[in-house]
C-alpha cells in the first residue's frame, strides 16, 4: 500500500514531468539495527513499480496487497487502482480495468460490507478470515469511501448517508463532530492511537460533494482548534494553543 501511494503520484500525469520514469528514480532503502544484517536497497521507477504492484495483486487473487504481514485492508488497495489508472493513461493500457474486475469479484465473495452495513476492514492473507468494522470506527468507512469514490462512486454514494448518520454528532450553530469509538483491543491490551477519524470524515464529505456536512465539520474545527497559519486559515492543530506565525 505504501508503495502504491508513491505509484499514484505519477509526475507525468500531475506535472508533465518524466523524472520518475528513469531507472532507479524511485528507490527505497531499508535498514534496522533491531534486526541486523546489511542494508537493503530496492531500485524502481514508475514502470517497474507499477509492474511489481500488479503482480502482487495477481498473486493474491486480486484480493489486494498486504500493507502489514498477512493484513489485506480493503482501504489500502485503492491507491494502487488509482496508480494503475494513471499508468494506463500514459501507456494506453487496460491494466486498471483488469484489476478492478478481479478486485470486485474477490471482495464480492468476501463481502464488501459487514452485517452492520459498514465496510469490512480487512482479510487475513493466510486464513482468509474477514475482519468487520465491529467498533464502527469512523476512519474505516471514511477512508475507504473517500478513496473508493474515485472508481466506484455509485456504490459509495448508495451507502454513504446511512454510514455517515451513525458517526456524526450535531453541535451548536450547525457544527458537526464525529463519535469517538472505544479503543481497540489486541492481544489482551487496549490500543489507543490517533486514527484521524475527524480528518478522514471531512475528506469523505468533500470527495462525495456533501457541502452541508463538510461545512458543519469545518465549523466544529474552527470553534475548537486554532488556525496554524495566517495565509491558510483552514489548517488546524488541536495541540497548538495559539496560531502559528
What label would you give each PLM region?
Residues 196-227:
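Extracellular low-complexity, Gly/Ser/Thr-rich intrinsically disordered linkers
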Residues 142, 243-245:
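C-terminal capping/lid segments that line or modulate ligand- or cofactor-binding pockets
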Residues 4, 54, 104, 145, ...:
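Non-transmembrane alpha-helical segments in soluble domains
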Residues 2-22, 26-36, 79-92, 143-154, ...:
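Well-ordered alpha-helical scaffold segments within catalytic/enzyme domains
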Residues 12, 105-108, 222-226:
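Amphipathic alpha-helical segments of tetratricopeptide repeats
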Residues 221-243:
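Conserved blade-ending motifs and adjacent loop-strand segments that build the rim/top face
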Residues 5-13, 47-61:
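Long, hydrophobic/aromatic-enriched structural stretches that serve as scaffold segments
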Residues 33-44, 48, 59-63, 67-196:
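Extended ligand-binding clefts on enzyme/binding-domain cores
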